[in-house]
UniProtKB/Swiss-Prot annotation:
Feature: compositional bias, Basic residues: 1454-1463
InterPro entries given in the database record: AAA+_ATPase (IPR003593), ABC1_TM_dom (IPR011527), ABC1_TM_sf (IPR036640), ABC_transporter-like_ATP-bd (IPR003439), ABC_transporter-like_CS (IPR017871), ABC_transporter_C-like (IPR050173), CFTR/ABCC7 (IPR009147), CFTR1_ATP-bd_dom1 (IPR047082)
Residue span of region Disordered R region: 654-831
NCBIfam families: CFTR_protein
Catalyzed reactions: ATP + H2O + closed Cl(-) channel = ADP + phosphate + open Cl(-) channel; chloride(in) = chloride(out); hydrogencarbonate(in) = hydrogencarbonate(out); ATP + H2O = ADP + phosphate + H(+)
Record PROSITE patterns: ABC_TM1F (PS50929), ABC_TRANSPORTER_1 (PS00211), ABC_TRANSPORTER_2 (PS50893)
Gene name of this polypeptide: CFTR
Binding, ATP 2: Y1221, G1246, R1247, T1248, G1249, S1250, G1251, K1252, S1253
Annotated protein name in UniProt: Cystic fibrosis transmembrane conductance regulator
Transmembrane feature ranges: 78-98, 123-146, 196-216, 223-243, 299-319, 340-358, 859-879, 920-940, 992-1012, 1015-1035, 1097-1117, 1132-1152
Role, per record: Epithelial ion channel that plays an important role in the regulation of epithelial ion and water transport and fluid homeostasis. Mediates the transport of chloride ions across the cell membrane. Possesses an intrinsic ATPase activity and utilizes ATP to gate its channel; the passive flow of anions through the channel is gated by cycles of ATP binding and hydrolysis by the ATP-binding domains. The ion channel is also permeable to HCO(3)(-); selectivity depends on the extracellular chloride concentration.
Amino acid sequence: MQKSPLERASVISKLFFSWPGPILRKGYRQHLKLSDIYQIPSVDSADNLSEKLEREWDRELASKKNPKLINALRRCFFWRFVFYGILLYLGEVTKAVQPLLLGRIIASYDPDNKVERSIAIYLAIGLCLLFIVRTLLLHPAIFGLHHMGMQMRIAMFSLIYKKTLKLSSRVLDKISIGQLVSLLSNNLNKFDEGLALAHFVWIAPLQVTLLMGLIWDLLQASAFCGLAFLIIVALGQAGLGRMMMKYRDKRAGKINERLVITSEMIENIQSVKAYCWEEAMEKMIENLRQIELRLTRKAAYVRYFNSAAFFFSGFFVVFLSVLPYAMLKGIILRKIFTTISFCIVLRMAVTRQFPWAVQTWYDSLGAINKIQDFLQKQEYKTLEYNLTTTDVVMENVTAFWEEGFGELFEKAKQNNNNREISNGDNSLFFSNFSLLGAPVLKDINFKIERGQLLAVAGSTGAGKTSLLMMIMGELEPSEGKIKHSGRISFCSQFSWIMPGTIKENIIFGVSYDEYRYRSVIKACQLEEDISKFAEKDNIVLGEGGITLSGGQRARISLARAVYKDADLYLLDSPFGYLDVLTEKEIFESCVCKLMANKTRILVTSKMEHLKKADKILILHEGSSYFYGTFSELQTLRPDFSSELMGYDSFDQFSAERRNSILTETLRRFSLEGDTVSWNETKKQSFKQAGEFGEKRKNSILNSINSIRKFSVVQKTPLQMNGIDEDSDEPLERRLSLVPDSEQGEAILPRSNVINTGPTFQRRRRQSVLNLMTRPSINQGQNIHRRTAASARKMSLAPQANLTEMDIYSRRLSQDSGLEISEEINEEDLKECFFDDVENMPPVTTWNTYLRYVTVHKSLIFVLIWCLVVFLAEVAVSLVVLYLLRTSSLQDKGNNTTVNANSSYGVIVTNTSSYYLLYIYVGIADSLFALAIFRGLPLVHTLIKVSKTLHHKMLRSILQAPMSTFNTLKAGRILNRFSKDIAILDDLLPLTMFDFIQLLLIVIGAVVVVSVLQPYIFLATVPVIAAFIILRAYFLHTSQQLKQLESEARSPIFTHLVTSVKGLWTLRAFGRQPYFETLFHKALNLHTANWFLYLSTLRWFQMRIEIIFVIFFIAVTFVSILTTGEGEGTIGIILTLAMNIMNTLQWAVNSSIDVDSLMRSVSRIFKFIDMPTEESKPAKSVKPPKDGQLSKVMIIENQHVKKDYNWPSGGHMTVKDLTAKYIDGGNAILENISFSISPGQRVGLLGRTGSGKSTLLSAFLRLLNTEGEIQIDGVSWDSITLQQWRKAFGVIPQKVFIFSGTFRKNLDPYEQCSDQEIWKVADEVGLRSVIEQFPGKLDFVLVDGGYVLSHGHKQLMCLARSVLSKAKILLLDEPSAHLDPITYQIIRRTLKQAFADCTVILCEHRVEAMLECQQFLVIEENTVRQYDSIQKLLNEKSLFRQAISPLDRMKLLPHRNSSRHRSRSQIAALKEETEEEVQETRL
């Protein structure tokens, strides 16, 4: 970056903003890069600004009980704010004085007033000087205020980030990532541009007072008629604004609903294609879009009338001011023209400036209050440690989720004793509730000495991670003691990767030691992976390690923890994503050898790890089930596995575990006795409650894709609210958990940033804490979305006791990754969305405009109609002018004066004919602007265009090949459907309408002036030419700067989300200062771009104004020097010239806005033009001899499965299959050939990342493939894609449940009857689950079906496959996140429902492979072995290495016995389970 020319710029250069000249020249000639941007001045650096504000905020906290952020801001910025306010006021005063001089100039042309004619030229000079002074005052003032707003935003951004790093885990559990981003973007962007309007809250009233005084001098009391009318217009506009908000609020829910389904579709596009659900998804989204557009139209009409009211008021305000005075006393022309000029300024002050200023203050103070409350939240308390301690000791430790939870529970139970629950089963609710009242850990005791390994085991939700949290100080015990040295290293359960190189991720700011680094890389099995990258360990990883596999991320995370030299290593299930072989090697070489002298606590569920541990701690429902050695465990607790896991059978699950499915259901229905109708629930299931108590604006951002554990209540093993630390802070600064009054107003204080009422706790689902505790699959890519459940509207308890219930329900609500926008709204749209770098032309091309206009044929007719109406208006005006001029000449010729007593009354003066002209001037802009027949059809048609474009884009996305999605970020696709479609719906129609209106007003005024004074036309031509050249020159650079600014905004939010996801790791490693520095760097980069954009914008605005001032000077002097007698002509010319000046500037700005918004259109066209999948057969098929398959030829690309005979058996032949993710990319699989007999079961084996899942995708033609596959003799080249995919049933690794009913999820095309669905649900063990929900099959699942465990979702995928009657079943790691019970159900279903199907299974678990007859071993992109289990066990294969000798002995007998013995299902299930316990993760 270069040094900014601002630092050495002269005063003149700063005053006229000529210092950004070089960058404008460069941007016009060539493409701007980041290196071309100037460095920021030191006064704008985030370090300086945040330090200044932090100092004042700390002062505020120290000195007052009730600290106010606005006081800290005042001490930092107040005097500069006042100075710029005064400049702004002086600039505005000149506008009020201009009409006075105008009046005097007009008066000097009165034939009776020849005395003043001599000073007309001096009056004109005075008028022109006023314009020059105004230009010189206004622009520096506005720029100064924008600059100051930017500084305030930077300081607050930094303060919020620093606070986020200090928040206690308990507070983090109450805040969603959506709220954090919303706090930064939606609230803080108000300061950047809003500050310039803030002063009008006092300037506008002063301006109105001054103007009314001046108009009173002219018209006496009748002046107030015009003001009264303007106030009525302003109030009317406020009413219309409220009506518009009402429509938009209604629409917000629909937009949200559409975006949720769209993001689910994009995120799971692979599943959508695998299931052939493209048409079903399109229909669902289009139906929602229809409803949304109806509301969009209504809102647009209201907004159109609101906009038209401003123009329309121009004529009436003058008319109402002048008419009463003229009727009573008569009026001279000078007064009319002066009044018109005064009224133009008055109208702006009353209907625009003052309402905007009030809105700005309202928004800004609201934002400051939210930030203030956030800054006062409870902080993470660093524990005091004894550095000399070598042991790790826990004595009688107990911890609760919430302080005082037990008491709250008792109170809630008493208050609800007599209430009926909607399904009438009281026990369900309270069995869950008692669980929630229990401590997360109770009476934990253990002691481990230096160098020992403690293995912590237990079922999901037993409190394993909470134990590690407590050691780290994230969760404070309510009783008991913890002792250790405090030198901790931590490896999280779900690997966290920061943006940077692999090396930076492992070293993580610790000093570099080559030998240690190499040892760690070797022990964590990373050598081979690193050697594959061209840049080795210096390869830059994207957000969340997007380019790495899950196993690679897990190993880097582990390497980071091991590299740090600590006394105690906390490893939270570090092997979750590793294959058996890698896990075994890392456990031995890293955990047992490399770290042998260190104290380690390992959360695990593997029997081998328990055997090798020095001590074992088994947790069950928060209590210590067992503590001791492995031999003691076998002696004392021989039944530990079945007891802990509930292996005996599903029915013998503990009540808590079984009912976890129901807990969210209960939240949806009122406990008050009146049941809520199902339809109502359905309506509300997408409704978003306000995010911060008042209208929350949008925030849609890329987030993570959560995978959920089996239990809903105990699902995160992390329960991490923490306990309220004993804080020295005053009570007001801490979160109050218990309401002050019995009425239970809110859980947090009223002004709290995140919660202004009890609704928040019920509707929170994805807290920041959950974000930290979820695994990420393609973290940076996957959009995660959340919609509120109906719980947001239905209380769980009577209103008075809501607060206690909220705490209960918050614990239940876990899953989801993101707050989807409450309202897609105006300028905020641009804030939160960050796109990849796109090669967009600097200025929107004419081709885009032409294509946009021709999208809908009626748009062309509407535009032609607009032009016709306009030409008619201009023609009428010219005719009127001609008639007036003729009558004026006749008047002069006859030299007659009409008597005041004649029928005309007192209005008529000796310049009567010109009086009529005033009506034209007054009505000119009203007539052009209102033109209701022109405006409404335009807005209506532009919304139709938006509808068509959305439809085309959706179809294009659904038909795009998977390679497109491999190169496109999901966030970018969702931005098209959210940000860009919202721009097309909301901003573009009205901005375009405004631009067309303003342009026509200017043209109309120029024509009138030119007719009256032809010389002026000569001055107009160069002005218009200058304006066009200047606009083109400026646009080239400004759009590039905007693009760079948008790209620079992305790292700020990415860094925030990344920091929050890795917060425990950050704090365990003490890296907060390093991350604050990185955040400040990201802020400074954004500031450099934004400041330069603001400066170039001011450069442009000032140049435009200078051109207009020159134009006005020319017009004034030409008029004065060439006009003869008669005040009418000079009055019209000067009044219109002043009007042209203001309007043309507005028109120029509108044209820039239109160009900017049209970029959204060009982005959408890019998506519409994407290539599509080849759905037609690649070659024709010869009719088979037996005639059986002839019907294949006539199946068209229909999604409905017809009962033809293909596929009949499921015989599959693969020949020379090669697969790539993208065209021209490296082959992921090469020359794969094998054959599978009908009904055979084949297991895929291979290390992590060997290509097993890729092979399954290749079967479905989801990749770029070469070679051939045949099913029952039919080649994939001979039939359509849809038909081919229909042959397969799929259970993907990433389960797809979209927002909709159970029925829709199982059968989106609605082909099956209820009986068929229930029969299949019975077969797969889903019936009992579905029947527990109200509405049964019609129960609406939202948030990816968060009320279901991962196992139940897998069962739904299984049911889909059974319903599709597929002959070949593909299973991609179905047991990865399953508890043993659900896994057994899946195994049983596979045996029964798919007995005669071909099954291809990809698995990590050895025991999962027991049913397979053949095994396909994939290594180095190709088939290494394809054989039966016996041969693989005899040879030296990967399969043989992966399992222990003991298991090897078991495998063959197990297969034989299980195939030949017949026994009852339950007995078989039980026996199999017990045999497998050795391998199963607890």
